[in-house]
Amino acid sequence: MLKSEMNIADFDADLWQAMQDEVERQEQHIELIASENYTSPRVMQAQGSQLTNKYAEGYPHKRYYGGCEFVDKVEDLAIERAKELFGAKYANVQPHSGSQANTAAFMAMMEAGDTFLGMSLAHGGHLTHGSGVNFSGKLYNAVSYGLDESTGEIDYAEVEKLAQEHKPKVIVAGFSAYSGIVDWAKFREIADKVDAYLMVDMAHVAGLVAAGVYPNPVPYAHVVTTTTHKTLAGPRGGLIISGSDDEKLHKKLNSAVFPGNQGGPLCHVIAGKAVAFQEALQPEFKDYQKQVLVNANAMVKTMQARGYKIVSNGTQNHLFLVDLIDKDITGKDADAALGNAFITVNKNAVPNDPRSPFVTSGLRLGTPAITRRGFKEAEAEQVANWICDVLDDIADESKINQVREQVKALCAKFPVYG
């Protein structure tokens, strides 16, 4: 018999210790991985609820199981809030991840072997935008576009040239490591010229879009996909939305999610999404996203003043790439040194990177998490200076130790969950 007082600590000490160690790491380390964030206790309450027990294959009011009247209500709330948040006419909240949202979108708009355009992984795209090791590059004919080397911005002329040459079924706009503002209207213009669908993957900027501080792709794209974590700060999961009136496309999208590539939805995660969407509709969420941008720019300016090269010479969103080629530092070594200083980053390829993806010559930094715990410009500048202190001599253990103690002291002043 199950008892409400059951807990992990008393039953599985090894697992509990690992969980507590991760809690301590999150509290004591500065999180600068651009795709990570801290979700709210309300979201975690939803994810730890008894909704996890319910199987609900199908969609609200059209289920294959009984007893779904309350999870129907939960999913309806999530759908309506997602539509309100992004100005969409359609939403599917069931994808378990951004990658599965992309998989479903591809299935709805293409057949195996069809051609699509996507941003090159080496220039800031995502695995699901056509990488040869991913389903998107294996099942479909992926053609990659990249950045204009002189500006560090998307090469729209190349996108149009490739579109005219290959006549793709779908053009994918979106990124995992691009610090500029994407011209969604230009992408739609190119897509219309070749009678292609425009799909936007806004996983990285969804929170910024929701707050109105980054252009909304919904009015331009046929289909928009996103994760619900990252800047949106919700549970780990995916979402598909559309501003289109094309009900045939909506039905294809629903069928591609279920039964196309998923079975039962995760009702507890959908509840977490509903909570996160409600949080994102509040005025303070816009203030948060504005500060994310301010903090990112403060870090960029500080690092540039210290002699570090920033790809595209700045940022217009929550992330930026540090090019370490001229410093003769690998991204792998920089990642490790900063990790020892309790500053968590991720190594990342930069344009024309001479090193392998496992080594790289750059770092990707983002400010959603530090802003979520209350950092403002002064703290962002301080963190940027600490990064430079470590990178100036990554073999200096005394400097790393000094920065680590400073990081721990700052984190103690700004607890993630106060």
Swiss-Prot record:
Family as reported in the entry's similarity comment: Belongs to the SHMT family.
Binding site for (6S)-5,6,7,8-tetrahydrofolate: L121, G125, H126, L127, S356, P357, F358
Protein EC: 2.1.2.1
Cofactor annotation: pyridoxal 5'-phosphate
Residue positions where N6-(pyridoxal phosphate)lysine is found in the record: K230
Compartment list: Cytoplasm
InterPro entries: PyrdxlP-dep_Trfase, PyrdxlP-dep_Trfase_major, PyrdxlP-dep_Trfase_small, Ser_HO-MeTrfase, Ser_HO-MeTrfase-like, Ser_HO-MeTrfase_PLP_BS, SHMT-like_dom
UniProt pathway annotation: One-carbon metabolism; tetrahydrofolate interconversion; Amino-acid biosynthesis; glycine biosynthesis; glycine from L-serine: step 1/1
A cellular-component GO term for this protein: cytosol
Keywords attached to this entry: Amino-acid biosynthesis, Cytoplasm, One-carbon metabolism, Pyridoxal phosphate, Transferase
Enzymatic class: transferase
Originating species: Idiomarina loihiensis (strain ATCC BAA-735 / DSM 15497 / L2-TR)
Reactions accelerated catalytically: (6R)-5,10-methylene-5,6,7,8-tetrahydrofolate + glycine + H2O = (6S)-5,6,7,8-tetrahydrofolate + L-serine
Assembly and interaction partners: Homodimer.
Main location: cytoplasm
UniProt keyword Amino-acid biosynthesis present: yes
Function: Catalyzes the reversible interconversion of serine and glycine with tetrahydrofolate (THF) serving as the one-carbon carrier. This reaction serves as the major source of one-carbon groups required for the biosynthesis of purines, thymidylate, methionine, and other important biomolecules. Also exhibits THF-independent aldolase activity toward beta-hydroxyamino acids, producing glycine and aldehydes, via a retro-aldol mechanism.
A molecular function (GO) term: glycine hydroxymethyltransferase activity
Marked site positions, Plays an important role in substrate specificity: H229
GO biological-process terms attached to the record: glycine biosynthetic process from serine; tetrahydrofolate interconversion
Keyword Cytoplasm (UniProt): yes
Highest taxon, organism lineage: Bacteria
Name recorded for this polypeptide: Serine hydroxymethyltransferase
